[in-house]
UniProtKB/Swiss-Prot annotation:
InterPro entries: Modulator_MzrA, SecD-TM. Interacts with EnvZ. Modulates the activity of the EnvZ/OmpR two-component regulatory system, probably by directly modulating EnvZ enzymatic activity and increasing stability of phosphorylated OmpR. The chain crosses the membrane at residues 18-38. This is Modulator protein MzrA. Belongs to the MzrA family. One of its GO terms (cellular component) is plasma membrane. Its main location: membrane. Residues 1-17 are cytoplasmic. Keywords: Cell inner membrane, Cell membrane, Membrane, Transmembrane, Transmembrane helix. Gene3D superfamilies: 3.30.70.260.
Amino acid sequence: MNQANSQPFTRRQGWKRILGLLLFIVAALTVVILPQLGHKEVSLQIRATHNGLATPDGFFVYQKLDENGVSITSITQDREGLVIRLAHPEQRTLALQVLQRELPPGYSIADKILHRSLFYKSERPAAATLSYSAGHNR
């Protein structure tokens, strides 16, 4: 009689453990996947506006942004120029001001927005009205 009563108790314990494990897996996946569903990165692209003008040195750009408190994720070269990915999108305006002040005339700085989701990645320049011509303002 004791064996008959202990079997249902063991089965209930097994189901509770399986249910607990499933809930843990769902919670862990939610924590990992949820931030990836709608991530937006703000980048700036520096391009030469004149033929023969070289792309600015990435280390120089990094140094100037860092000196002014702008945190960046990466600086990479692409076929059109230099792409600077900002660590904090709210620092975009400060980064633009620093680059406009530090770069010599002949460079264009444009916003580039990267939308990432779990299933889709889109990289496109922002509206043309957000393009700036760098150089010292006197």
